[in-house]
Amino acid sequence: HGDQEVLNKIASEKIEKDNLIYVNFDINTNYIERSTCLEETGLELSEKVDYESYLREVARSHFILSPNGNGIDCHKHWEALYLNPVPIVTNSINIQHHKHLPFLILKEWRDFKESDISEAKYASLMKGFNNENLFFQNYCKELGWIK
């Protein structure tokens, strides 16, 4: 979906986090899931922007709302983790395999309003997280495929 060079550039800039939550996705990718997400959270979509501007907004946010798209694995989850906001997601088989990563996992979108969405919660979820663990070689080591 994205441009790896632009993603790496934004990641290297170490942008200060000054936004609590960012909401930007194409509602039509999975209309039922994503419209439910917006209805239940009470949040509004941000204005559509180009990819680099989108990544800058992701990088300056503590959390991003990341509903599933066409499947249970969404590139927004991984872009967010690489740029260090916490993706807010609903539980799925895929998310269960990544419990060691800093996701804020909701059973359903209606649970959002009772969730702790704060800078303190962000710090708690991110404690000890190193996005280098997302790199393929490190992931293979974690799975025991290479030493």
Language-model-detected regions and their locations in the chain:
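A short acidic, often aromatic-flanked loop/helix-cap motif at beta-alpha or helix-coil junctions
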Residues: 109-115
